[in-house]
Amino acid sequence: MNSDILLFISFLVVYFVLPTTVKSQNLVKNSGFEVSYNLPEYWIITGPVISMQPQTAVDEQIRFEGKHSLKMESNNPNCHGRAVQTIDIKGNQTWFFKTRFRVKEVKSIDKSVLIRIKWFNGDKNIGYNYVYEIAGESDGWFLATNKIKPVTEATSAEISLEFRWSTGTIWWDDISMEPCPDEPARNVKVGTFHFRPPGPTVEKNVSLMGKLLDEAGAAGCGIVCLGEGWPTCNTNIGMKKHEANSIGGSASKMMAEKAKKYRMYIVSGLYNWDNDTLYNIAVLYNRQGNIQDIYKKVQLPDSETEAGAVPGNTFPVFITDFGKIGILICYDNFYPEVARNLALNGAEILFNPIWGDIRGTDSDVEKTIARSRAIDNGVYFVNSIYDGNTLIINPAGEILQETNKQGTLITATIDLNYNPPWDWVGNAGRGVWKDIWKKDRRVDLYGNPIKYDSPVLDKDKKDK
């Protein structure tokens, strides 16, 4: 494992495992339901419709720690009940929330287990967050955590532990909400090229792309995106067998050298023959100049299948030293499921080497689609296009940089912790969409994302 990935893992440990350097101060009263007489003190048991509430009581038999847990049990598939507690907070303070829960005969945790924190200014509901980071633990218990920055004007928070739309049983225990340090910015300078290699030879294309990579390196880019199948563009070679159409060819070697020289990640489209099997791929070169990983294009148009190309079958998400990225190639972007699977698997930036998109009658159709992919999934979106506009877009769908000028590099310094609340997302006030869509998504209907197993690369190409 290389030093860049170790650095990112160290960040995750500090961010998630060691969330506080502030003195521990749990604001939740009766956090383990120890002070209880059938129903827990300081908690209000309620729900939208009284007759639809699950049976709720303190349980002495099953608990995470201490003597008690809170048990909600239902034989009504349309049940909806809550345990609610309101605490006083400071709106300019970041908070670390956690709770443990376990379930029995509940079909979908995503659908039926909801942890919501509403923010109030006086009696006015001014926003909310979902707690959606859930990890399995031993003995059947789950740990739900989030590091949350409330709406600035908030003076109190309503913690709501909810069981809804299912039969079965849920137990709650070990709830806490404590002040913690603010999230540090996670800045990275991203770059992308609007460049259709002119040919007529691979050598000329490689030389010109090398000069553009020198420009990106001099600009201090942390990662840069290149176009689809660029080495053989305008050469009459296309996807045919050729040294340039391989991860060991001249174009790939040049990119590896530039990545190492400038300690810069490179995302590049490439055609790749593996013996007699042809793939349309995107390669991620790391800062050491090694091929870190490869994405194989999933959605192939007829022109590529007729050339003999074979599709990939997974949606990989790659860990860099600044965050997680996903890649989709050209026709992949015509299908919203590709971007959605990458986002569900954790991608924070989507890179898109793309020839073009000429659907519809609007000449700016690719802008609309690219902005939609960013907004729908709460991610940054960066393309490198031949026919259209090369774009850098933030999770709010705002175009940070764009160009359609041949041979141009555009850059933007982005913060991967950018996670703004939006008005009228969900059912009340302001919501953080990046959190909300992952929780409200009906996984019981749509299914889980397709998981990814990293391919085994040749030993000399894999990070040491």
Give the role of each language-model region.
Residues 1-25:
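Bacterial Sec-dependent N-terminal signal peptides
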Residues 128-129, 281, 293-296, 352, ...:
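Residue-level detector of high-confidence beta-strand sites
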Residues 273-348, 358-361, 368-372, 425-427:
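Active-site catalytic loop in hydrolytic enzyme cores
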Residues 185-199, 203:
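Short beta-strand segments enriched in small/hydrophobic residues
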Residues 23-189:
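Extracellular and organelle-lumenal recognition/adhesion modules and their flexible linkers in secreted
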Residues 139-142, 147, 384-464:
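C-terminal beta-strand edge segments of enzyme domains
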Residues 245-267, 330-411:
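CN hydrolase (nitrilase-like) catalytic-core segments centered on the catalytic cysteine
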Residues 214-287, 359-371, 376-377:
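Cys-nucleophile CN-hydrolase/nitrilase-fold catalytic domain and related Cys-dependent amidase chemistry
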